[in-house]
Curated annotation (Swiss-Prot):
<dbReference type="GO" id="GO:0042450">
    <property type="term" value="P:arginine biosynthetic process via ornithine"/>
</dbReference>
<dbReference type="InterPro" id="IPR020557">
    <property type="entry name" value="Fumarate_lyase_CS"/>
</dbReference>
<dbReference type="InterPro" id="IPR029419">
    <property type="entry name" value="Arg_succ_lyase_C"/>
</dbReference>
<keyword id="KW-0963">Cytoplasm</keyword>
<dbReference type="InterPro" id="IPR000362">
    <property type="entry name" value="Fumarate_lyase_fam"/>
</dbReference>
<dbReference type="InterPro" id="IPR024083">
    <property type="entry name" value="Fumarase/histidase_N"/>
</dbReference>
<comment type="pathway">
    <text>Amino-acid biosynthesis; L-arginine biosynthesis; L-arginine from L-ornithine and carbamoyl phosphate: step 3/3.</text>
</comment>
<comment type="similarity">
    <text>Belongs to the lyase 1 family. Argininosuccinate lyase subfamily.</text>
</comment>
<dbReference type="InterPro" id="IPR022761">
    <property type="entry name" value="Fumarate_lyase_N"/>
</dbReference>
<dbReference type="GO" id="GO:0005829">
    <property type="term" value="C:cytosol"/>
</dbReference>
<protein>
    <recommendedName>
        <fullName>Argininosuccinate lyase</fullName>
        <ecNumber>4.3.2.1</ecNumber>
    </recommendedName>
</protein>
<dbReference type="Pfam" id="PF00206">
    <property type="entry name" value="Lyase_1"/>
</dbReference>
<keyword id="KW-0055">Arginine biosynthesis</keyword>
<dbReference type="GO" id="GO:0004056">
    <property type="term" value="F:argininosuccinate lyase activity"/>
</dbReference>
<dbReference type="GO" id="GO:0006526">
    <property type="term" value="P:L-arginine biosynthetic process"/>
</dbReference>
<dbReference type="InterPro" id="IPR008948">
    <property type="entry name" value="L-Aspartase-like"/>
</dbReference>
<keyword id="KW-0028">Amino-acid biosynthesis</keyword>
Length: 457
């Protein structure tokens, strides 16, 4: 039976019912709805709506229902209830009879669903934070094991300067740390309870909403009933965090897809995260990474869709707001799955050090070192930049790396160049000179690993 049927003389058209009902997706709020109902029953005792004995009977029935839902959640979808609130109330009435009809006193589905969704978001943020930190730890461990793996760093997908695989890993640790911070920051604004705000104007019962918030594990209660039932900022914030986080994971995936190509050959992915071709027996495709990259778009779409849903809504609750859940559920599920999958990819990755080093020695990635050498000899940087550009052109013409050009050739471009230039052009020198904070020098990378390990403990 609908929770609102008394006003109507005709039954809802079945087509409208199918269009209107939300149980097929808000069933995921079942546990939160039951937990919120237990807390509400306690609040009703404080204002004399329920006796202590009635409340105990309701709480016992709700706890039995909670265990039943955890054991067999699929039972919810076997119902034709309008939404999860109707389903829980119907099951409660089945268990305790008329007493179950007293529970909704002073409560609206508007503050009820807002509370349920916030509780679900809090639970899910906790899962996301755990998965995020697990991936950070996997990256730090991979970095620690590959501090000596020299590889080319890229700009414009052109070899630019030597870096290490460890330094590359730590770049993504920084991105994930910002994702973690965004989630923690969003959690602060999320951690306020709307329960007790009624449909929009507040409840007519003098319930201690701060006490009620505490029972539910919220830091405090909201301050304005009209805003409380209308607010979906937390949905937008979490979708935004997910969208940014998925961009980071997509870039991570794209890098590794490139590193795994036959043309680059820097890494070998585990058989556990790759697949083959139905036609070409030799293929080993990076499907896990491609799916991470591909799933980024659906999360961006969820954020955009929710922005458009909310932008024109008047206060307070409107049925449009039912659209907040499917996109949110899908986006956060996707982000969580991709965090886990990225960690699994790292678990079996093999870095091909000889190939990485060979690539780092190609493409004149040490050209900047020669320019810095000239600057140290008193040549203005802009002039040094031009000199080195000419030297690179000559090296390309001869098919040699810069360090293989004889001194007489190098001195054609600048007389200040001496024998001491050759150690400067080595890969090790290129790395060691980047010793400022955040640089790629072995010392800085080791410090960054130690800092990340300490932060993640």
């Amino acid at each position: 039976m609908a929770l609102w049927g008394g006003r109507f003389t005709q039954a809802a058209d079945q087509r409208f019912k199918q269009f209107n009902d939300s149980l097929r997706f808000d069933y995921r709020l079942a546990e939160q709805d039951i937990v919120g109902s237990v807390a509400w029953s306690k609040a009703l005792v404080t204002v004399g709506v329920l006796t202590a004995e009635e409340q105990a009977q309701l709480e016992e029935a709700l706890n039995v229902l909670l265990e039943d839902v955890r054991a067999r959640p699929q039972q919810i979808l076997e119902s034709d209830a309008e939404d999860i609130h109707s389903w829980v109330e119907g099951k409660l009435i089945d268990k305790v009879g008329q007493l179950g009809k007293k529970l909704h006193t002073g409560r609206s589905r508007n503050d009820q669903v807002a509370t349920d969704l916030k509780l679900w978001c809090k639970d899910t943020v906790s899962e996301l934070l755990t998965a995020n930190r697990q991936l950070q730890s996997a990256l730090v461990e991979t970095a620690q094991n590959n501090q000596d793996a020299v590889m080319p760093g890229y700009t414009h997908l052109q070899r630019a300067q030597p870096v290490t695989f460890a330094h590359w890993c730590l770049a993504y640790v920084e991105m994930l740390a910002r994702d973690e911070s965004r989630l923690q920051d969003a959690l602060k604004r999320l951690d306020v309870s709307p329960l007790g705000c009624g449909a929009l104007a507040g409840t007519a019962y003098e319930i201690d909403r701060e006490q009620l918030a505490g029972w539910l594990g919220f830091a405090s209660a909201t301050r304005n009933s009209l805003d409380s039932v209308s607010d979906r900022d937390h949905v937008l914030e979490l979708l935004s965090a997910a969208a940014i986080g998925m961009v980071h994971l997509s870039r991570f995936a794209e890098d590794l897809i490139f590193f795994n190509t036959g043309e680059a050959g820097f890494v070998e992915l585990s058989d556990r995260v790759t697949s083959g071709s139905s036609l070409m027996p030799q293929k080993k495709n990076p499907d896990a990474l491609e799916l991470i990259r591909g799933k980024c778009g659906r999360v961006q779409g969820a954020l955009t869709g929710m922005m458009m849903t909310l932008k024109g809504l008047p206060l307070a609750y409107n049925k449009d707001m039912q659209e907040d859940k499917e996109g949110l559920f899908d986006a956060l599920d996707t982000w969580l799955d991709c965090l886990h999958m990225a960690a699994l990819v790292l678990d079996g990755i093999q870095v091909k050090r000889p190939r990485c080093q060979e690539a780092a020695q190609q493409g004149y990635a040490n050209a900047t070192e020669l320019a810095d050498y000239l600057v140290a000899k008193g040549v203005p940087f802009r002039e040094a930049h031009h000199i080195v550009g000419e030297a690179v052109v000559e090296a390309i013409r001869q098919g040699k790396p810069l360090e293989d050009l004889p001194l007489s050739e190098l001195q054609k471009f600048s007389q200040v160049i001496g024998e001491d230039v050759y150690p400067i052009l080595s890969l090790q020198s290129c790395l060691e000179k980047r010793a400022a904070k955040g640089g790629v020098s072995p010392q800085q990378v080791a410090q960054a690993i130690a800092f990340a390990q300490a932060r993640l403990e």
